[in-house]
Structure formats: C-alpha cells, structure tokens
C-alpha cells in the first residue's frame, strides 16, 4: 500500500476529526467500553503528548452516541444501544494561567457555552454554583445522566507550582468547582479526569472519595501509548517506508524505534509503550529525532529543578523508591522526583515485590540524551543546542588516541564555567564529568561509576579502552595507584585493545583540573 494514501493524525486530538479524515487509529475502544460501562469517577495521569486528549475526545464521541465514528473498531461489536447523553467537556490545556482571574475566565467561558444549551439561573453566581445548576438542568431536560470529562485538570496548578499563594488560590477555586461532582452525584452518569500529576494532601478531588485512580493499575496500563504489537500491526507500511529511506532492514528499524521511543511502563507488569507523538513524527519525517523532547521541557519542571538540591546523577543511573516517593507530588517537600516521573522523564524499569520497591529510570534513548542535554546548561556554560557538537569532539579525540587534547578540552570546559555555576564541592565536579561521559555514550561505549568498586569512568573505542580515576585535591599518582590496586583493568586484560590509564586531580581553589597523567 502507498503510505502517501494513509493519513497520519499529526496534530489531531479530536476523535471525530481523526475518523472523519480517515486517519490511522490505534484501536483502544475495547478498554474504553469497559471503563464507560461503570459509573465510578476515574482519574488518569499520563505525560504530556501521550494521547490523553484523544482519549477524552473518544469518550465524548461514545457518550454522544456517535456510532458512525466507531465503524470497524472493537467497540462496534460490544455496544448495542448507542445511547446519547449530555456531555460537559472541560479542557484546561489551552490557556496560560497567570492570575486567578485567568482561571475563572476560562471556567466562565465553558459555563456560558453550557448555559446556552441548558439554560442559566443567575450569571452573578459563583462558578461552582453555576456548574451545579447546569448539571441538574442537563439531567432534567434530557432525562439522561450527565457525562463530565475534564482534560488536563492540573494545568493551572502546574503553572503556579512555586508560587504558594497563587497555588492555594487555584486549589481553592478548583476544589470548589470539582466538589460539585460529589453533590451532583444523582445527576451524573460518568466522570473521567486526566492530568500530568496527582497532587497529594489538599487535593482538588478530596470530596470525590470514590475517585478511581487508574494511573498505575495493570488493566489500564496500555490505554494511552502504543505497544510494540500495535506498532507493527497498525504501521507496517510506515515502518517499511522508514526502513527503505534509512537503508535499514525492517527488523533493525523496529529495534531502532524501540531503543529511541519505547520503554514507558506505568505499572510493574505490562508491555513497554511507545510515545505516540514521537512515533507519528518519525513516520511523517522519515528520520529518527528527539521529537517529544524538542517540544520543550515544561516551565514548572525547570523551575522545580532549579530550586531543589537533588543529586541528578541518581536519575541517570536509575534509583529505587517506594510508590509513595513518586506517585503523588507534595509541594511542600520540593522533591522533584514525582514531577520528573509523572512528566514522562522517568518510568518504571523494575519492581521488587518482596520489598515493594520500584526502580525508576529513563524510558528510552530519546528521553535519556534529551534530559542530559537539558541538564548541561545548569552546570556548564554550554547551551543545550551545543552539547552534541561538544560530545562529538570529546569522542573523536579518544578515538584517535589523543588523550592530551581530550584533557585540555576538559580543562577549557571547566575554565569557562561562570563563577556562580561552579562550586568547590566534589559533587559538582563529578556531575560535570558524569554528564560529559554520559553524553559521549551516544557515540561510544562509555560507562560512569554508579557504585564503589568500579573505575570513575571507562570509555571503549574501536582500538582502545580508557580507564579514568578522579581525585579532588589528590595526587595524580594516587589515582593511578587506585586503578591498579582495585583491579579496574582486570576485566579487559584479554580484550585485545590497548589499555590506557588516566589519573586526574582537581584543584578546588582554581576550580579546574589540576594535573593529569596518562599511562
């Protein structure tokens, strides 16, 4: 089949438009039918650009009784009645919320639209009073339970994350507004809310005591995103075209897609998921790139990382944590981990059932190297746009055996770091080296120590294996001696490549590399 005849839903987030234009669709309607059959309120947390808006739009089409839009899909064989319900769809994603007035204005915009259909009582009443009246009138006028769909419920909260007064004001407004859903329960047929994160403690949903949070529940794990099976069954012609353009085999193309965009796990027991945004853009552009990451790191996450003193190396190597450590965000702790996880930069890699501990790590290469490049400007004078170029220079010098140029470039790297970015702590030096070697890992086999008993860094090129040991205010010979005494070279003795030891000392006063020796 000519792939030009197959339409990719690039930029389309409404189910009706996607189906009307004949776009490709990964069929999730069986699980949608299962959820819609119940009457408890649902909440789903997923990263941005992961299909939440399309999911909500699909629920909207289903509850509007739009049987014509579901022809050929799994739900067509499951649903027999196709009843029509009044649907109130609130999307908070489209606006920037700088003041409480902005939030109230957005709520009023939707309330006025609904009042035009179901009538109003008094316009000067509070948003929650008007919302309550609309739900009651929608029920009385149609004789059907009301469906309430809220997309990106937390957008205002995320934009006020580090402004406690504004955050409290948004919470107060939304808590009162969403609280109507409890008092109006007898008029409601179905509730589904989505967002990036779940806020703990003073939750805007505290009145919805029956809220079913399906974010980490196994039966719902694949409701957003694309499994490998779905990728191959839905997009085989696109994969074949991509393989042709990239001059790769079909199998290698799927493997490359898997390394770049797969790996999201929202429970400890399910298939990995591909990021749908990146998948569609790869097929559209016919080249591998960091599509999701290039859409920008959310401002709230940037601000949170700036304010926290979190050792970011923990994220790079993976870390163990209980579910309470990442499932809910607590604003008062300033711990960025839950927000990093829920924003899609970390995912579940493993689960120890005996200890109830999760291992979190980067889901794939797109996120891993995108995040490393994002961190570089916080520790060095290099912009994220320049990181690829600089990493390649470091790699080429080691590939050619020019350790001297490599170390001199590293010296220049440190010398250019502004005073306010630099500290005399060993951790700061370690993080910078850590980031450099990790970024080199895109091009060569580069390992950085994450545990005792290993060299600080090992880089393997075609002809050589380099072992680096770093000392703060130490002696270069001590670093070299440690390489020998700890046996860091032993695993590579029979490798056949040239083995190179590099001892490095830091001068904390000068905030730079003091000496280095190559053996």
Features from the language model and the residues they span:
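Short beta-strand or tight-loop elements
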Residues: 451-455, 497
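Conserved catalytic cores of phosphodiester-cleaving nucleases, focusing on short active-site segments
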Residues: 433, 457-472, 486
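Structural motif
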Residues: 147, 464-466, 500
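Phosphate-binding site recognition
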Residues: 1-425, 440
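Domain-level recognition of nuclease-like catalytic cores that cleave nucleotide substrates
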Residues: 491, 495-519
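A short acidic/basic microdomain associated with nuclease active sites
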Residues: 436-450
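Mg2+/Mn2+-dependent nuclease catalytic core
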Residues: 168-172, 472-489
């Amino acid at each position: 089949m000519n792939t030009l005849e197959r339409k990719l839903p690039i930029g389309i987030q409404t189910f009706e438009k996607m189906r009307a234009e004949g776009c490709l669709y990964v069929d999730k309607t069986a699980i949608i039918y299962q959820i819609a059959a119940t009457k408890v309120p649902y909440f789903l947390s997923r990263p941005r650009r992961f299909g939440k808006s399309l999911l909500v739009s699909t629920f909207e089409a289903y509850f509007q009784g739009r049987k014509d839009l579901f022809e050929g899909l799994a739900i067509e064989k499951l649903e027999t009645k196709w009843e029509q319900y009044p649907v109130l769809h609130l999307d908070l994603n489209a606006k920037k919320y700088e003041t409480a007035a902005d939030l109230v204005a957005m709520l009023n915009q939707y309330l006025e639209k609904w009042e035009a259909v179901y009538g109003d009582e008094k316009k000067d009443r509070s948003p929650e009073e008007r919302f309550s009246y609309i739900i009651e009138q929608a029920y009385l006028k149609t004789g059907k339970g009301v469906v309430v769909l809220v997309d990106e419920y937390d957008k205002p909260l995320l934009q006020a994350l580090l402004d406690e007064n504004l955050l409290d004001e948004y919470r107060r407004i939304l808590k009162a507004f969403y609280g109507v859903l409890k008092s109006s329960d007898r008029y409601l047929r179905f509730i589904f809310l989505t967002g990036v994160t779940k806020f703990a403690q003073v939750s805007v949903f505290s009145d919805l005591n029956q809220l079913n949070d399906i974010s980490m529940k196994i039966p719902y794990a694949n409701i957003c995103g694309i499994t490998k099976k779905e990728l191959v069954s839905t997009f085989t012609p696109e994969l074949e075209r991509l393989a042709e353009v990239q001059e790769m085999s079909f199998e290698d193309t799927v493997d490359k897609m898997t390394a770049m965009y797969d790996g999201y796990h929202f429970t400890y027991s399910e298939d990995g998921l591909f990021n749908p945004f990146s998948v569609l853009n790869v097929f559209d552009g016919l080249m591998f790139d960091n599509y999701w990451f290039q859409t920008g790191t959310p401002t709230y996450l940037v601000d949170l990382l700036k304010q926290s003193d979190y050792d970011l190396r923990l994220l790079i190597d993976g870390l163990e944590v209980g579910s309470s450590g990442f499932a809910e965000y607590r604003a008062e702790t300033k711990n960025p981990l839950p927000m990093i996880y829920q924003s899609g930069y970390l995912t579940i890699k493993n689960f120890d059932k005996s200890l109830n501990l999760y291992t979190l790590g980067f889901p794939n290469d797109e996120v891993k190297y995108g995040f490393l490049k994002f961190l570089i400007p916080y520790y060095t004078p290099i912009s994220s746009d320049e990181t690829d170029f600089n990493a390649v220079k470091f790699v080429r010098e080691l590939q050619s055996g020019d350790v001297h140029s490599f170390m001199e470039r590293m010296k220049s790297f440190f010398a250019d770091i502004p005073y306010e970015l630099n500290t005399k702590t060993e951790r700061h030096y370690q993080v910078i080296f850590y980031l450099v070697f990790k970024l080199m890992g895109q091009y060569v086999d580069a390992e950085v120590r994450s545990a005792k008993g290993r060299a600080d860094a090992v880089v393997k090129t075609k002809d050589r294996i380099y072992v680096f040991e770093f000392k703060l205010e130490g002696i270069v010979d001590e670093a070299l001696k440690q390489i020998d005494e700890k046996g860091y070279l032993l695993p590579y003795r029979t490798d056949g490549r040239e083995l190179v030891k590099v001892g490095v000392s830091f001068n904390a006063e000068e905030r730079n590399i003091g000496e280095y020796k190559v053996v």
